[in-house]
């Protein structure tokens, strides 16, 4: 059986490799020169693997190392921020290894940690930290097809093993292999390899929590659509004005492109016509849409194939091989017991040799089951996850296109509204000018007011004379006798008694005010008391919105072009890697079958030779 970390089906060779032989150690801490990584051949048993955990050298490696030291490693201009950055920058082809997976000693064994070895540095990370790394890379590079990580525990896992689901050794070994594949896939992507967040994940002196809560991860907007696609951590002020489309938004169907959208089933191959737009052609976004739609359709078909028939066949095959191995193990023990009970000098050894062949076939079948699972079944499940990643990247590009259309539509609406408001304002000014000119021609008469004034004075004088005559008939008996003529205010006692009744009126209307006050306020809010001022304020706000949308339109157009170019570039890279991977998987499948058949054939040929020695007499 291979070591867990050796079950990496994505290496550059199908031969088994030692988990530690690919690590590099500096020749001296002062020079910081590194040996060129050259994966050696790995023995076929675990016991042999345990003796090869050091750095393996051969003559060719020494010669290449001398050449490397003469030329010197590629150094970064401006220096390095940390040791791990230097290792990753100067050794871009260095494999990242996960050497161990087990319970954390620091946490008292509450969770599983994975030991990552990069050169001569080691760091321990949890599965949740791997998930946060991938999430950060996805947000920092929304146009890149970031490799997936193994899935979390499903409800079926907890139902089957409710107490020890997280400590299931098979799941831990699977994650150990696939997380190493994830790290090495990311390492081969230049945009990620040069990202500071990426190499800080391998820095034992860096706090991963602080990395996630600092720039650039913390500077990414809550909605990735309000950020530039190539630099989401540094959005411009104009990005704040971009509208956010719904997650289910789709592109508008343009007449004349339907025939392109339905050309999904295209020939396979890196140079197949129609998979990608031709080189050297400057196509518009609407002309690029059919290529993206066709690629998404082909990826969806591949996902259905991998998660449907292929997954079922792989599960049945591995199950049958495991059952066959168990039967061969039992058969070997039966033959061995039978050989002990047989007293014939030639028959006993032959039966024993049959039992040994069955035992060795059991071991070979177990190895076949493990190698097929690691080199074929697991990669197929990973590619099914890749299909979902590709769809999400293409969906991001679609949402950027929809965002551009929404910005253009909103800008057109605001401009139409501004034209309407300006026309209304011009009409209102025309009417106002007409009314003001009419008032200057015919001023209103003022004679009627002057005619009404004398009667009021006469009434006031007459009322005063009547009051004085009444007071003379009824002289006062109290007060100051020196004053025989009381004032007019003293002759009106009834009016003073009517004041309290008037003071009670507001208290009687307070209930009405409480009931109808909010209604009156709402009606006044609906019925504009100053339509001219409201119209002018609305014109100002509309002009401001138009200015913001014009800025948003410029950045949206730029974002769509950058997103389409970056997505298309990474799609080509992914397509090439996918075809290389599928070719490697098929060869690995055939190689595993060949090795199993050779071992089985050799054991049973030796058993047949022993059986032919049986004395027939």
From Swiss-Prot:
InterPro entries: AH/BAR_dom_sf, PX_dom, PX_dom_sf, PX_Snx41/Atg20, Sorting_Nexin_Autophagy. The keyword Transcription regulation does not apply. It comes from Gibberella zeae (strain ATCC MYA-4620 / CBS 123657 / FGSC 9075 / NRRL 31084 / PH-1) (Wheat head blight fungus). Keywords: Autophagy, Coiled coil, Endosome, Lipid-binding, Membrane, Protein transport, Transport. GO terms for molecular function: phosphatidylinositol binding. This is Autophagy-related protein 20. Disruption phenotype: Significantly decreases the radial growth of colonies under nutrient-rich conditions. Strongly reduces conidiation. Causes only mild infection in point-inoculated spikelets of flowering wheat heads and impairs the spreading to nearby spikelets. Strongly reduces the production of deoxynivalenol (DON), an important virulence determinant. Residues 480-500 have a biased composition (Polar residues). Residues 20-31 have a biased composition (Low complexity). Residues 1-83, 434-516 are annotated as: Disordered. One of its GO terms (biological process) is autophagy. Residues 403-440 form a coiled coil.
